Structures are given as structure tokens and as C-alpha cells.
């Protein structure tokens, strides 16, 4: 121990190691050693997916096997919208048209995520089986500066539904030409002209958009404007909404009768740490294939993040009649 070791050193032959002063110093050294050992143990735990506790560590380790945790997902509902009175050869419901509902005394807004046009049938203007998403549309822009080596394109909200994310690149502030980029699902087939973007979860549960390096995916240029358009959600709170009213207008008309086809459902928060630990190695082993039962289970869970349980079996497991 420390007392025995120090008492055997020539420099401390005249010291009384039973004295209160020396005992206090030895206690400090012992405590320091204990805490260093504890910190080293905790640090070692965070180095492995199985034992990591911090979300940032789990996300980083999952990234090493090419797995991106799923974002929050917006609650969705399906409705029929009968607009009356209305006129014209056609009627267009603009993207972002708002519908309101109330769940447990709290008001929420739903929006449609694409322009929808219809023509009247026997004079009736009806949008059938319209899918609406809970949340509000937000827009964020970055101007690319290649001289800033630390520049990042982070979506500044932690409840974004990345499935609704639209990424566009405007040439410059003086050139309004824009190109829409798509989410890269892999690197196969990518080249220097591929207009794709990549996603990764970063600190605070937010998501970062990044682009190719000019070899795997087209690189952004100095002065380009990155436009991020997305829905920010209230996670699972609006699930169960049953009735909706039109908050905005449809083609300038504000009177509408709304029938709910399916109640609001599917809203979720960020993928849990336990789910990331389970899915990351299986997603890596599946390699986007659908061959084994485990492959199918992994793919289904990645497509339907709100699924509470997935059961898969192959014909080889079925009992012979």
C-alpha cells in the first residue's frame, strides 16, 4: 500500500507515517487513485456497443457499422376533405395546408406534405384518403463557406421527422437555380455528379446533413445555399386524434367538411438506446438484404420505427401438414 511504499523510500525516513498530516495526504492519494480507476472503467464501458450507456457513445459506435438511428416520426392520419362551395375546373390543396385537432385538451396542427389537385365529380370537390402529418413546416438555410473547415449543416430542432426532409441546393444568392438532393441509401452507384446527401445523428439528438466529397457524391461549392425543409413534430403526443378541422384555406375556400378515415397514429420519439444497440449489428449483418428471417425483421423495424414487435418466420419453419 501507499504507506508501506513511501516509508521505504530514503527521502521519507524521518517522517512519521502515523501522524494525522501524513494520513490525510495518503487519504487524498488513495481517493485520487480510486476515482481515476473509476473514470477509466467508465471510459472503457463507453468504448463498446454492448456496455455503453451514453446516447452519444451508442450513436457513435453504431455509426462505425453504418447505422443511422431513426429520427422522431410525425403522427399521421387519413381524412376525406369535401370543399363546398367551390368552383373551377380543378382545385389544388397546397402543401402545408393546416388542419387542427385536440388531444387531452392540447391543440395540435396537421399538414399535408405535397400539393394535391383534384377535378370535381358531379360538381363535388372531394380530396379522398388525404394523408396529413402532425407538426409544422420549418425552413432553414445555410450559405456554404469552403474556407470554414468546421462548417456543419445541422437541423436546429431535436424533434424533426427526417422522412419529411427535403434538401435543396441553390446555386448562389444571385442565382435562384435550385437542385433537389436525395438521401443516399448506400455508396453503390455514386459518382462525382450524384446529387445526394447523407444524414447522421449528432449532439442533442439533432441531425446533421452532409454532402459528398466530389468522389462519392457531388460536393457543394462556395456560395451555394443549402435549403432544409422539414416537419418538426410533437412526437407521440398527438396519437389518437379523431377529429380535424380546416385551419387554412383550400384554393381560397375556407369551408370544408372533414371525415376521418383513420385516426392519428405512428408518432414516436427518437430511436431508443436499447433499440439502437439491437438494430445496429443486425442491420450491418443484413447489408440491406432480405434473405434470412433476421434480415426481414431488421428491415421491417427500420421501415416502421413505431412497430412495437416484429415476428418473422420462413417456410422452412412451418410445420408440415
Residue ranges of predicted features:
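Signature of Asx- and small-polar-rich beta-strand/turn repeats characteristic
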Residues: 1-321
Amino acid at each position: 500500500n501507499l504507506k508501506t511504499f513511501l516509508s521505504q523510500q530514503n527521502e521519507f525516513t524521518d517522517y512519521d507515517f502515523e501522524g494525522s498530516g501524513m494520513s490525510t495526504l495518503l487519504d487524498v492519494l488513495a481517493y485520487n487513485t480510486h476515482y481515476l480507476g473509476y473514470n477509466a472503467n467508465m471510459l472503457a464501458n463507453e468504448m463498446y456497443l454492448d456496455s455503453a450507456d451514453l446516447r452519444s457513445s451508442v450513436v457513435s459506435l453504431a455509426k462505425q457499422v453504418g447505422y443511422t438511428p431513426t429520427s422522431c416520426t410525425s403522427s399521421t392520419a387519413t381524412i376525406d376533405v369535401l370543399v363546398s362551395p367551390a368552383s373551377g375546373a380543378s382545385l389544388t390543396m397546397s402543401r402545408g395546408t393546416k388542419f387542427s385537432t385536440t388531444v387531452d385538451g392540447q391543440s395540435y396542427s396537421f399538414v399535408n406534405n405535397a400539393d394535391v389537385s383534384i377535378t370535381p365529380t358531379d360538381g363535388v370537390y372531394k380530396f379522398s384518403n388525404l394523408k396529413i402529418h402532425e407538426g409544422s413546416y420549418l425552413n432553414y438555410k445555410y450559405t456554404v463557406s469552403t474556407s470554414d473547415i468546421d462548417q456543419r449543416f445541422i437541423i436546429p430542432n431535436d424533434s424533426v421527422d427526417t422522412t419529411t426532409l427535403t434538401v435543396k441546393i441553390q446555386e448562389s444568392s444571385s442565382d435562384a437555380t435550385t437542385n433537389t438532393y436525395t438521401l443516399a441509401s448506400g455508396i453503390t452507384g455514386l459518382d462525382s455528379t450524384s446529387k445526394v446527401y447523407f444524414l447522421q445523428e449528432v449532439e442533442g439528438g439533432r441531425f446533421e446533413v452532409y454532402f459528398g466529397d466530389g468522389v462519392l457524391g457531388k460536393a457543394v461549392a462556395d456560395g451555394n445555399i443549402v435549403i432544409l425543409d422539414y416537419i418538426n413534430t410533437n412526437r407521440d403526443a398527438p396519437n389518437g386524434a379523431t377529429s380535424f378541422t380546416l385551419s387554412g384555406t383550400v384554393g381560397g375556400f375556407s369551408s370544408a367538411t372533414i371525415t376521418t378515415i383513420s385516426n392519428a397514429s405512428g408518432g414516436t420519439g427518437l430511436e431508443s438506446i436499447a433499440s439502437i444497440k439491437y438494430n445496429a449489428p443486425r442491420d450491418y449483418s443484413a447489408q440491406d438484404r432480405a434473405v434470412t428471417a433476421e434480415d426481414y425483421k431488421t428491415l421491417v423495424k427500420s421501415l416502421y420505427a413505431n412497430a412495437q414487435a416484429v415476428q418473422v418466420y420462413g417456410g422452412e419453419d412451418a410445420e408440415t401438414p
